[in-house]
């Protein structure tokens, strides 16, 4: 009683698609559905050829290794899904980190034909600190972060973690968003009545490295791409961290291109991006090989970054044919994509 049925799930996805969305994302670490509901969301999205991404976790599992273990049963024989930020489920909360990595890679290999996936490489994560009226932390992700260091999963536990420098919240400054802990962090937490963004240094460097470079017996990457995951926070370090992997020997330079450009484009069916080929969009990022950062950027033939400074403006909304009319009404430029060509449905 009070749960969501299949017809309601279809309505949710249809509404999103008609409004211009390319699909849906299930936030299992924050607003978990039952396993049956989660499976139904995936099935309904697949039947509509809608994109469906999944931050793991249901009412029976967490946003941890147990959530990944649940994937085969949620997908069944035919389900297709994008599993978000695999490294977030390998923080050592169930098994030692090394064992979680091995098991995760095996699960992903077993369902490879049904999933696409990525990792992010920043040490800090992103979560929400909101608490219920009794002071209990609501988000499973935030609870897990507190438990990792023995803090209570309460508002007071968050205040202690902020004072100790383990937790941070976000403050907007003239130069952008910054992570803040200590006394100022507690002040922001209290001013927001606990409903604030939180960050913890919980992403393990070992899992980030091993999950990024791992290959199967066919010499293919088990995990398709590297993503920023909430890049609005001061942790969009894809290029910098991947260049460290190149310097270390974990990735070849062209493999960096596969992880950061080619596969992300293929994942959502952007056939004109991800490679320098005649007839494709003229996109180019020039990286300083010494400092490992982007210094020049060209998008569709237009210079958008000079010496690391963004000089471009404007953007396009990606939508599907059924959402084009709604997006057109906004007056914002848009591009229609064909999700039958997305890696999730078209294969690798």
Question: Where are these predicted regions, by residue range?
Answer:
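Short, surface-exposed connector motifs at secondary-structure boundaries
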Residues: 20-25, 47-53, 80-82, 194-195, ...
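Active-site beta-loop-alpha junctions enriched in small/polar residues
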Residues: 1, 27-31, 55-61, 86-89, ...
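Acidic (Asp/Glu)-rich catalytic clusters
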Residues: 13-18, 41-47, 71-78, 110, ...
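Flexible loop/turn segments at secondary-structure boundaries
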Residues: 32-34, 60-62, 90-93, 124-129, ...
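Active-site-adjacent beta->alpha loops and helix N-cap segments on the catalytic face
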Residues: 31-44, 63-67, 97-98
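Divalent-metal coordination cores built from histidine and acidic residues
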Residues: 1-28, 45, 49
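Active-site neighborhoods of metal-dependent hydrolases
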Residues: 13, 22, 87-89, 95-244, ...
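Active-site microenvironment of metallo-dependent hydrolases
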Residues: 14, 185, 189, 204, ...
